[in-house]
């Protein structure tokens, strides 16, 4: 009989209890009889996945007589090994809590109450609202006469709570309807991750995976409080420490993470580029970089064209009227063949390496210290410890979260870290990488499946009006390289897009009609359809209705007062949630008369994780299947809402006709949602009999790998990255629970037979950079892959080609970049080819030493009467506010505040401040406090603590305070949204808001009305 970790623990538990009690002289007969009467006795074990952060711990749900009786961590899962954080441990309580929505509810315009309705009536009403809006508002052609087929009056928000299969359903439905205003949580949490990592490496995902952290020699945690916000992931950090790694925490406040690290270095929020830029300067000036890695695998030798310049904080090509750059001024110098000119000697003053060196020479210890508030001694402490990994036998990893992303320079924060890791040779290696600590349960998968306005599934660009035909699209989005040793993998894009369209429109999609490409909605070039612009257009009355599923923007979006006012202007709204939230109940928020709110609201009860089946993708790209443990009652999963809703809309078009019905009627749709059917659709099918190698496949069989996808209509795939996850030979690979490894794989904890991960089950991205040009590992003691003379062994290599020493067949390791090299210098970002320090939109300074340009010259903002930004060094608001999550609450708290034991542990909104600031303001620990920004105010309880200290910045004292954002008015007397204070200023690349740095003032409250 096979013994699993779980069965072993059960046996050990019984034997240990028996041994202990027997030694104490107890009669064990009664105790043993009682032990078998545990509440899980006779219960069925069902595997599910925790619905909170992207560690995605696996959970055992115990079911007896169709009812959930208990949940616990799965000890067999290699990542969590049975462990759960406070939220995961409360999974059973969240399922059973009395606040769950159980039936569809309806709020009529101007009504002050909810009314119960049945599903059929509710979906019929929603279908009618959607069709009427689509018939009236569909834009067939733009002002230039170009076919665009888009619907702007309806929006879709959500959700990273959806499974991959639900995401596939939602995306296909929205594009069929013509919706362009589609976004989800990734926009406001980790959108800079994709934009930054893809610019440097080619892909936007976490480079390594959770278990791999144990292999590192140095951990730099910056912009994250990992111990509190990713507790299970943190155990792999502690494994690294047990193995001898040095742990560093750089963060504005001292926390549990700081306490477990070797040292903590506080820095002022919003100054990460200055801090990291100083490290870049330190590496180059001290000659600490990994020369072979830099020379062979990066674009350090590329020569930049003569139009490039940088002067006083501004790159060449800047237009102050439009606040944008002409990025053509940053292009590389071209040779006679049209390819990049390179100088392997690195002597050309315009080669990337020398331009980078010059750019960061200004980032001296003094300048960095003056801006960040970090002493020169502490700067060197971090720099020296981390830069010691810039050698073949060492590796360092950087871990970050929203402390980096939620800034007007969020993308460039992360980009700066890529410069460091490339200089040190820490990408592609075990224990290396830049690893995003994502906080949403399927934010990786929901981004892969593109619940975002600007991309199609698999990170393909969303069509714009200029690309009228599929040929136009392919020409604009398929890169061409002159370098024969570059794989240029995106040259395969036409195959992936044709297969996607075939999956969406089935037999209707043919080569003759461009695979129904015309049906896709087309964006206007340069227009932003993201969350923040949806809300601004809503505020100005330009939207009629929409869907908000599994997200609570009325609590978690910045400048919340504006957001709440905007929602009042909708004609209708459809929400799907586990509980009432600040969004679902916006019409009856404090200070508002429900009778004055016209919005018609349909509130649909959402199925809990244990009530549905499907897959999620954790932050390390592992595709994990979860089974349905119990029936959902009248609650429904998101796909079981959208599948019948689309069918009802289709029925209306068949009966009545209407505007542009074909994109809806010709969808390759289904009558009923079956999650495993959609898992197969995501993988993809052959639509014609095909021979692959010596194996023949029939129409309707599964495509075995994305290498077999075609651009001729003979294959389909709803996401090329996931092709190979479900095959005729091996079935559904996301269900695999096989912990077997080769000794080489086990040495670094790859677990290649547990679940499956994209792409092609590769566990460490860019792993061909972990070897030298002969295919030998830089660090043989922690080899990821190795060339044995005929093939690669270890992890699945980033391409099958031989090592670079083979001049004819060898390929560069960064295969998703056009020219195959990792990029120190990149031309694809809106705010510069190199990261540059700029102050936050709201800053306590009126100057800094790096340039005369105070804040980013291209950050985005709105100009309505409710969009205000405090002036630099505003004496009315002298204090920096940063926001953060809590261990016990998930993000905005909409779910966890409804779990009594979690609310009891963290019951109310508080503000952390230093003793010095408290003394200055006459505030004592436990006092009620009013916190005010130029946009709004919030109440909080003072937590006076030495965990936060004042900073000395540019010769003056700057105070910082911190507040969680997990509270809202629907939970009585706990406080309301912190985001009423935060600023509506956004990164120019991804429009993520700057929630981690704004200006406020604090005072002792005479009276509290929001907190008991």
Swiss-Prot record:
Cofactor note: Binds 1 [4Fe-4S] cluster per subunit.
Primary localization class, coarse: periplasm
Gene Ontology MF terms: 4 iron, 4 sulfur cluster binding; electron transfer activity; formate dehydrogenase (cytochrome-c-553) activity; formate dehydrogenase (NAD+) activity; molybdenum ion binding; molybdopterin cofactor binding
Residue positions binding [4Fe-4S] cluster: 50, 53, 57, 85
UniProt binding sites for W-bis(molybdopterin guanine dinucleotide): 189
PTM note: Predicted to be exported by the Tat system. The position of the signal peptide cleavage has not been experimentally proven.
Alphabetical list of SMART domains matching this protein: Molybdop_Fe4S4 (SM00926)
Cited Pfam families: Molybdop_Fe4S4 (PF04879), Molybdopterin (PF00384), Molydop_binding (PF01568)
Swiss-Prot/TrEMBL GO biological process terms: anaerobic respiration; molybdenum incorporation into iron-sulfur cluster
Induction annotation: The trimeric FdhABC(3) complex is the main formate dehydrogenase enzyme in the presence of molybdenum.
EC number(s) reported in the record: 1.17.2.3
Keywords, in A-Z order: 4Fe-4S, Calcium, Electron transport, Iron, Iron-sulfur, Metal-binding, Oxidoreductase, Periplasm, Selenium, Selenocysteine, Signal, Transport, Tungsten
Reactions accelerated catalytically: 2 Fe(III)-[cytochrome c553] + formate = 2 Fe(II)-[cytochrome c553] + CO2 + H(+)
Residues noted as binding Ca(2+) in the record, renumbered to the chain: 389, 391, 394, 424, 426
Domain of life according to the entry: Bacteria
Temperature-activity note from the record: Optimum temperature is 51 degrees Celsius.
Cofactor requirement: [4Fe-4S] cluster; W-bis(molybdopterin guanine dinucleotide)
pH effects: Optimum pH is 9.5.
Domain 4Fe-4S Mo/W bis-MGD-type span(s) in chain numbering: 43-99
Annotated compartments: Periplasm
Signal peptide start and end residues: 1-33
Cited PROSITE patterns: 4FE4S_MOW_BIS_MGD (PS51669), MOLYBDOPTERIN_PROK_1 (PS00551), MOLYBDOPTERIN_PROK_3 (PS00932), TAT (PS51318)
Biological role stated in the UniProt entry: Alpha chain of the formate dehydrogenase (FDH) that catalyzes the reversible two-electron oxidation of formate to carbon dioxide. The alpha subunit of formate dehydrogenase forms the active site.
Family, per entry: Belongs to the prokaryotic molybdopterin-containing oxidoreductase family.
Subunit structure: Heterotrimer of cytochrome c3 FDH2C and formate dehydrogenase FDH2 alpha and beta subunits that forms the FdhABC(3) complex.
Name of protein: Formate dehydrogenase 2 subunit alpha (cytochrome c-553)
Protein source organism: Nitratidesulfovibrio vulgaris (strain ATCC 29579 / DSM 644 / CCUG 34227 / NCIMB 8303 / VKM B-1760 / Hildenborough) (Desulfovibrio vulgaris)
């Amino acid at each position: 009989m096979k013994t699993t970790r779980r069965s072993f623990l059960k046996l050990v538990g019984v034997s240990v209890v028996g041994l202990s009690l027997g030694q104490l002289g107890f009669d064990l007969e009664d105790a043993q009889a009682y032990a078998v009467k545990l509440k899980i006795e006779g219960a069925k074990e069902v595997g599910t996945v925790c619905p909170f952060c992207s560690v995605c711990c696996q959970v055992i749900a115990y079911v007896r007589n169709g009812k959930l009786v208990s949940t616990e961590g799965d000890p067999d899962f290699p990542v969590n090994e049975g462990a759960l954080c406070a939220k995961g441990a409360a999974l059973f309580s969240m399922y059973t809590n009395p606040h769950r929505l159980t039936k569809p509810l309806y709020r009529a315009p101007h009504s002050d109450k909810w009314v119960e309705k049945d599903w059929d009536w509710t979906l019929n009403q929603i279908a009618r609202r959607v069709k009427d809006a689509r018939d009236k508002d569909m834009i067939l052609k733009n002002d230039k006469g170009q076919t665009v087929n888009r619907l702007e009056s309806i929006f879709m928000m959500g959700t990273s709570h959806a499974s991959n299969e639900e995401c596939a359903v939602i995306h296909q439905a929205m594009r069929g309807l013509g919706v362009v205003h589609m976004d989800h949580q990734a926009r406001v949490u980790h959108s800079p991750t994709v934009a930054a990592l893809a610019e440097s490496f080619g892909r936007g995902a976490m480079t390594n995976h959770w278990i791999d952290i144990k292999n590192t020699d140095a951990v730099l945690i910056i912009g994250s409080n990992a111990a509190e916000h990713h507790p299970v992931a943190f155990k792999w950090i502690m494994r690294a420490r047990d193995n001898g790694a040095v742990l560093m925490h750089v963060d504005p406040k001292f926390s549990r993470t700081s306490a477990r690290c070797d040292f903590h270095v506080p820095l002022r929020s919003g100054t990460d580029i200055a801090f990291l830029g100083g490290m870049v300067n330190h590496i180059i000036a001290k000659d600490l970089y990994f020369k072979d890695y830099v020379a062979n695998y990066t674009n350090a030798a590329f020569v930049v064209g003569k139009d490039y310049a940088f002067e006083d904080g501004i790159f060449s090509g800047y237009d102050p009227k439009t606040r944008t750059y002409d990025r053509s001024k940053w292009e590389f110098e071209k040779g006679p063949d049209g390819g990049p000119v390179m100088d392997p000697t690195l002597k050309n003053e315009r080669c990337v390496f020398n331009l980078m060196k010059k750019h960061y020479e200004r980032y001296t210890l003094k300048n960095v210290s003056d801006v960040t508030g970090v002493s020169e001694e502490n700067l060197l402490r971090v720099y020296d410890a981390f830069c010691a990994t810039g050698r073949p036998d060492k590796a360092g990893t950087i871990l970050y979260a929203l402390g980096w992303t939620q800034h007007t320079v969020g993308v460039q924060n992360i980009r700066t870290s890529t410069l460091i890791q490339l200089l040190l040779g820490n990408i592609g290696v075990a224990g290396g990488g830049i690893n995003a600590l994502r906080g949403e349960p399927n934010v990786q998968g929901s981004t892969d499946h593109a619940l975002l306005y600007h991309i199609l599934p698999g990170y393909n660009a969303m069509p714009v009006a200029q690309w009228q035909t599929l040929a136009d699209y392919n020409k604009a989005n398929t890169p061409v390289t002159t370098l024969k040793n570059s794989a240029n993998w995106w040259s395969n894009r036409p195959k992936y897009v044709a297969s996607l369209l075939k999956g969406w429109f089935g037999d209707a999609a043919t080569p003759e009609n461009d695979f129904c490409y015309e049906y896709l909605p087309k964006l206007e070039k340069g227009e932003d359809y993201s969350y923040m612009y949806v809300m601004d257009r809503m505020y100005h009355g330009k939207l009629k209705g929409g869907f908000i599923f599994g997200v609570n923007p009325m609590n978690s979006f910045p400048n919340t007062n504006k957001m709440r006012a905007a929602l009042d202007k909708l004609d209708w709204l459809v929400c799907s949630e586990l509980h009432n939230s600040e969004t679902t109940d916006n019409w009856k928020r404090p200070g508002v008369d429900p009778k004055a709110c016209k919005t018609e609201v349909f509130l649909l009860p959402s199925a809990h994780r244990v009530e549905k089946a499907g897959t999620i993708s954790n932050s390390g790209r592992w595709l994990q299947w979860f089974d349905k443990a119990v029936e959902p009652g009248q609650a429904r999963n998101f796909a079981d809402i959208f599948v019948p809703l689309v069918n009802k809309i289709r029925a209306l078009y068949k009966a009545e006709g209407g505007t542009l019905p074909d994109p809806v009627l010709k969808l390759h749709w289904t009558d009923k949602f079956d999650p495993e059917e959609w898992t197969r659709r995501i993988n993809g099918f052959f639509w014609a009999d095909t021979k692959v190698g010596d194996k023949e496949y029939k129409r309707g069989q599964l495509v075995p790998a994305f290498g077999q996808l075609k651009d001729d209509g003979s294959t389909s795939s709803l996401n090329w990255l996931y092709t190979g996850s479900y095959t005729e030979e091996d079935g559904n690979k996301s269900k695999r629970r096989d912990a077997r490894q080769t000794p080489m794989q086990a040495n670094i904890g790859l677990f290649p037979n547990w679940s499956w991960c994209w792409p092609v089950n590769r566990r460490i991205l860019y792993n061909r950079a972990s070897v030298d040009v002969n295919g030998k590992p830089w660090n043989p003691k922690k080899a990821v892959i190795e060339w044995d003379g005929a093939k690669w062994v270890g992890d699945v290599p980033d391409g099958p080609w031989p090592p670079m020493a083979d001049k004819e067949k060898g390929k560069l390791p960064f295969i998703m970049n056009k020219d195959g090299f990792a990029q120190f210098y990149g031309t694809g970002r809106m705010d510069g080819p190199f990261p540059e320090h700029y102050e936050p939109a709201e800053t306590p300074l009126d100057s800094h030493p790096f340039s005369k340009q105070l804040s980013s010259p291209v950050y985005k903002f709105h100009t309505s009467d409710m969009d205000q930004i405090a002036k630099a060094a505003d004496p009315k608001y002298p204090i920096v506010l940063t926001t953060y999550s809590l261990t016990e609450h998930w993000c905005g708290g909409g779910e966890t505040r409804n779990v009594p034991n979690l609310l009891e542990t963290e019951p109310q909104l508080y503000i952390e401040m230093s003793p010095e600031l408290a003394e200055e303001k006459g505030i004592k620990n436990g006092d009620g406090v009013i916190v005010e920004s130029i946009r709004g105010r919030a109440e909080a309880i003072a937590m006076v603590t030495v965990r936060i200290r004042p900073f000395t910045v540019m010769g003056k004292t700057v105070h910082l305070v911190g507040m969680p954002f997990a509270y809202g008015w629907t939970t009585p007397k706990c406080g309301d949204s912190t985001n009423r204070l935060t600023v509506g200023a956004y990164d120019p690349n991804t429009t993520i808001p700057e929630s981690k740095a704004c200006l406020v003032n604090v005072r002792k409250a005479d009276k509290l009305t929001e907190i008991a």
